[in-house]
Amino acid sequence: MQTYTTQMDAARKGIVTPQMETVAKKEYRTVEEIRQLVAEGKVAIPANKHHTCLDPEGIGSMLRTKINVNLGVSRDCKDYNIEMQKVMSAVNMGAEAIMDLSSHGNTQPFRQKLTHECPVMIGTVPVSYTHLTLPTT
């Protein structure tokens, strides 16, 4: 039974997660080094439980720099499938993170597709999403 809610929570309880083990291998560090860095808040391992195909990465002190790609649906490009092709191209070329900057239309289906099909870290910019949900006057 899982007794933690976040990677930091686990690390502070002395628990090594499968995500920490993966990050340790990728970063050529011991699992205990990674656990300690996460516990101290020097490393983050984004690992949302809804991101079912995630291949975890660590971000922070003493780790490799990661490649991030910005994309998303917009007024000019509304086709989710085209954006997903861009996502997979970016991943195949070595991107380790995708920042979803979607700014037009119903963006939730695109984000759900990302979390089910994209194996790298995913981030969003809440301010970009906020203007889509505010009532118009």
What do these predicted regions represent?
Residues 34, 38-39, 44-56, 71, ...:
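Glycine-rich, proline-tolerant flexible connector loops at the mouths of alpha/beta enzymes
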Residues 66-82, 132:
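Active-site mouth loops of central-metabolism enzymes
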Residues 7-57:
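An N-cap/entry alpha-helix motif that binds or orients negatively charged groups
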Residues 1-4:
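Basic/polar N-terminal segments that are highly enriched at the extreme N-terminus
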Residues 61-67, 108-127:
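Alpha-helix-loop-beta-strand connector modules within alpha/beta enzyme cores
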Residues 50-51, 73, 120, 126-128:
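Short glycine-enriched loops at secondary-structure junctions
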Residues 130-136:
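Conserved small/polar residues in nucleotide/adenosyl-binding loops
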Residues 85-98:
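Catalytic domains of carbohydrate-active enzymes, especially glycoside hydrolases
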